[in-house]
Swiss-Prot record:
The gene is aca1. SUPFAM superfamilies: Acyl-CoA N-acyltransferases (Nat) (SSF55729). Substrate binds at residues 118, 155-156. Its main location: cytoplasm. Homodimer. N-acetyltransferase involved in oxidative stress resistance. Acetylates the toxic proline metabolism intermediate (S)-1-pyrroline-5-carboxylate (P5C), or more likely its spontaneously forming tautomer glutamate-5-semialdehyde (GSA) into N-acetyl-GSA for arginine synthesis in the mitochondria. P5C has been shown to increase the levels of reactive oxygen species (ROS) in the cell by inhibiting the function of the respiratory chain in the mitochondria. The enzyme is able to reduce intracellular ROS levels under P5C-induced oxidative stress and protects cells from damage by oxidative stress. It comes from Schizosaccharomyces pombe (strain 972 / ATCC 24843). Optimum temperature is 20 degrees Celsius. Pfam families: Acetyltransf_1. Keywords: Acyltransferase, Cytoplasm, Mitochondrion, Transferase. InterPro entries: Acyl_CoA_acyltransferase, GNAT_dom, Mito_N-acetyltransferase. Belongs to the acetyltransferase family. This is N-acetyltransferase aca1. Gene3D superfamilies: 3.40.630.30.
Length: 209
């Protein structure tokens, strides 16, 4: 697998922002605040109880391992459509107010199947309904194959998560299976089904055509 830090940032298509890959080795100015913001994002989603199977909020150390052990891509706004991607080592970014969203990329299986990745997506609670999730999804299709993954599997897309289902199917993800009674979600009686989605990344040569 390729070092995520060597992959060029991806410019968002719908607003002025860049998606940048980071991991535990990335030099980020005020990285602790970035981690704190990511921790807030995931714990907010856990508390909502609608999209992640996790039901216990993460500590700072758990979140650090969750986000930085392999790779997380962060979405950072810039002033204009001609602004370059910020240098994370030197840029003074107020992560609490500026971080638009993020997603992790990691192997979905060990060993002989580690070329198949999984991703989890988070949009800032204060920046929702602005198309950020759609841009994160497209950034995922950019970064994952460049890291070296051949395909992606999402293990649990709950049947109640209509926006997510529409997004992945619009991007030609294949519904590979259904898990009956997969989750106990807040606001729903009984159990909710979940879908498994898979996507085969085109070769980088084909993607650049």
């Amino acid at each position: 697998m390729k070092d995520p830090n060597t992959i060029p940032p991806w410019r968002c298509t719908d607003f002025n922002a860049w998606c940048i890959a980071v991991d535990k080795s990335t030099n980020v100015k005020n990285k602790e605040e970035l981690l704190s913001t990511l921790t807030y994002f995931i714990n907010y989603e856990i508390e909502m109880g609608q999209t992640y199977p996790i039901d216990i909020k993460m500590t700072r150390n758990e979140a650090e391992d969750f986000f930085f052990k392999f790779c997380t891509v962060i979405c950072v706004p810039v002033e204009s459509e001609t602004s370059p991607a910020p240098d994370l080592a030197t840029a003074s970014i107020d992560w609490k107010t500026s971080l638009l969203g993020a997603f992790y990329i990691k192997p979905n299986y060990p060993g002989r199947c580690s070329h198949i990745c999984n991703g989890g997506f988070l949009v800032s609670p204060s920046h929702r309904s602005k198309g950020i999730g759609r841009n994160l999804a497209n950034a995922y299709l950019y970064f994952a194959p460049r890291i070296g993954f051949k395909s992606s599997v999402f293990n649990l897309v709950f049947a109640t998560n209509i926006k997510s289902i529409r997004l992945w199917e619009r991007l030609n993800f294949t519904r590979a299976g259904i898990i009956k009674d997969a989750g106990r979600l807040k606001g729903h009686e009984g159990y909710v089904d979940a879908y498994i989605y898979q996507y085969h990344f085109p070769s980088l040569e084909d993607a650049l055509k």
